[in-house]
Curated annotation (Swiss-Prot):
Residues 270-518 are annotated as: LT domain. This is Membrane-bound lytic murein transglycosylase F. It is found in: Cell outer membrane. It is a peripheral membrane protein. The lineage of its organism: Bacteria, Pseudomonadati, Pseudomonadota, Gammaproteobacteria, Enterobacterales. Its EC number is 4.2.2.n1. It comes from Shigella sonnei (strain Ss046). The N-terminal domain does not have lytic activity and probably modulates enzymatic activity. The C-terminal domain is the catalytic active domain. GO terms for biological process: cell wall macromolecule catabolic process; cell wall organization; peptidoglycan catabolic process. It holds the Pfam family SLT. InterPro entries: Lysozyme-like_dom_sf (IPR023346), MltF (IPR023703), Solute-binding_3/MltF_N (IPR001638), Transglyc_AS (IPR000189), Transglycosylase_SLT_dom_1 (IPR008258).
Amino acid sequence: MKKLKINYLFIGILALLLAVALWPSIPWFGKADNRIAAIQARGELRVSTIHTPLTYNEINGKPFGLDYELAKQFADYLGVKLKVTVRQNISQLFDDLDNGNADLLAAGLVYNSERVKNYQPGPTYYSVSQQLVYKVSQYRPRTLGNLTAEQLTVAPGHVVVNDLQTLKDTKFPELSWKVDDKKGSAELMEDVIEGKLDYTIADSVAISLFQRVHPELAVALDITDEQPVTWFSPLDGDNTLSAALLDFFNEMNEDGTLARIEEKYLGHGDDFDYVDTRTFLRAVDAVLPQLKPLFEKYAEEIDWRLLAAIAYQESHWDAQATSPTGVRGMMMLTKNTAQSLGITDRTDAEQSISGGVRYLQDMMSKVPESVPENERIWFALAAYNMGYAHMLDARALTAKTKGNPDSWADVKQCLPLLSQKPYYSKLTYGYARGHEAYAYVENIRKYQISLVGYLQEKEKQATEAAMQLAQDYPAVSPTELGKEKFPFLSFLSQSSSNYLTHSPSLLFSRKGSEEKQN
């Protein structure tokens, strides 16, 4: 996956550039058949999407997601409300454009030559590759050549179907596959790890998120190179919507909003470690149940799952952990820090967790107010790891290298430079193991993604079991057995003042279609 960026891949680029050149004179309000004028007269922007971990989802009725957030800001930019329609699969999305039921498709859709024959693409904002996945314990194919429809299934409307057909026509005549009209890519990946399906194909970002919860899913091979992701609108000769999108994305790029959204939803990294993730999830089952009450008790302003992720990064949830540098306990506190916090026994799990939270809150309070509220936690964690003074040096170095010292995406790139003499020799507080602070924060984010997604999967399984029990014993009301609410990725949906993580975790796909007004 590549970084978020503006990429002007428009099939009708001459017409689009003309629309941009004439931007000030476009009669948005005066022409009845002008697309922007119609949207503003209607008072709402109609966007169709699908439920995925990255694009759109809800917690307690509150929507979130990369594409949702961008669409909401675009609606605000146009001065209208956002109306979201959730569809089951990609084919239904394009049906909405064909039938005039949507102004835009915002669903992490890949730009390709077939789609742009019939639909207008917008600016591209990140990229993915398509990959064949399998279960770790099963046979790993090294080529597509011998795969059959009994082995390979893909989701309806998936962009890879065109690529598979090209490969069949030019290279692998024996290749065949099946399209499951009822399932999306996430459900098909679940089928793979459950042994119901040998192989499927999904995009690299979706796979990366899925692996944080299901490390037994592995990539067999790449099917495509990196492909840009974009939005689509009707291709009807009216360029006003395309021009507005271009201007909007340019503005978002220039003021740093795109970079912040990239860091929020895509900043978890894509360097998956199977052994580490599997070990962590085993600890979630074996160790976390005893520690969960303590994390919930002392979490206060942060999500308890974030606190649990911090503690795992520090000590692997070992209250007796000791470092050669002298730090000890669940939260690996120094002797001086422990004394300043009134901790008498660093190896006492409760004292250590309580003290660690107070120390983190102290770091949070020192982060400059100019840092966006939803990014302050990352600055605080870097300070927690290497010291507040060195975090200030990292911000200063970021500014010197023409970055934004208030943007975590920029500052974290400068952290490794704190251990390089040409840089630290010119800084106020000198040498620091900035590369360790970088890895520290990134690991915590990955652990929380895994933890929240894994706990959610267990909640889902428990709810499904309860519903099945109700069907087996109909005298028990299914709604009574399944009514307990469970945390659909609440670490992303709650207000930024809770200092929760900003990388999305895996959500199971929702079926059917829904409409939401925002």
